[in-house]
Regions:
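Conserved N-terminal beta1-alpha1 strand-loop-helix module at the mouth
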Residues: 1-61, 68-71, 86-87
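Hydrophobic faces of well-ordered beta-strands that scaffold small-molecule active sites
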Residues: 14-18, 35-38, 60-64, 90-91, ...
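Conserved, mostly hydrophobic/aromatic
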Residues: 27, 94, 134, 171
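Ordered, amphipathic secondary-structure segments that act as subunit-interaction surfaces
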Residues: 73-97
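Histidine/lysine/aspartate-rich catalytic loop segments that bind and position anionic ligands
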Residues: 95-126
Length: 189
């Protein structure tokens, strides 16, 4: 794992997940936010969006699955983000995207939706792609987060449905290193 990314997450365990320009403006004005998860944009705008994050001195992580125009499951999407933006890394649910990003020396977050026991049992297998972080969604399942943290060697993030301080503390107490949220009130904690 790249130490800079790990250190930024450790120093600021609340990650701003941004889904629109209004949220971007708010997170850029929030000094405590060091890492930004970009959950919006298209192939025409993502370079400018990333540039704003970088100009604010924050790490920019682009959710490769959510950039309009990068459809399909081809690794060329990761190549595009690497060559056409200043993104520090990617977020994806696709192991092949994570592998390609690692080859390009980008930071990586593999998102895992834990919706049932089969998904939970598959988490350990996903670790074989060696992401920098596993992000468990939804992030409001402390017992499940605790099980995953005990089963894997990759640091865990919790994301999705985190609405208040209680959710943040429960996820962190369960072993998550940080949380990501679109909830702007949580960013201010």
């Amino acid at each position: 794992m790249e130490q800079k990314f790990y250190d930024a997450v450790a120093a600021s365990p609340i990650i701003a997940a941004v889904k629109n320009m209004e949220g971007l403006e708010q997170c850029l004005a929030t000094d405590s936010i060091q890492v930004v998860f970009l959950l919006f944009g298209d192939i025409c705008s993502i370079g400018d969006i990333v540039a704003q994050v970088k100009q604010a001195g924050k790490l920019a992580m682009v959710h490769a699955d959510l950039v309009t125009g990068l459809s399909g499951s081809k690794e060329i999407a990761v190549d595009f983000l690497h060559s056409a933006t200043q993104a520090d890394g990617i977020i994806s649910t696709r192991p092949n995207f994570i592998r390609r990003a690692r080859e390009l020396h980008l930071y990586t977050v593999l998102r895992v939706f834990v919706i049932d026991s089969m998904a939970l049992s598959g988490v350990e297998k996903l670790e074989s792609v060696h992401p920098d972080f596993l992000e468990v969604l939804p992030g409001v399942m402390p017992k499940t987060i605790r099980k995953i943290c005990a089963a894997v060697h990759t640091p865990v993030l919790a994301g999705g449905l985190i609405a208040d301080k209680e959710d943040v503390l429960a996820a962190l107490s369960a072993g998550a290193m940080a949380i990501s949220t679109t909830n702007q009130q949580v960013w201010m904690m």
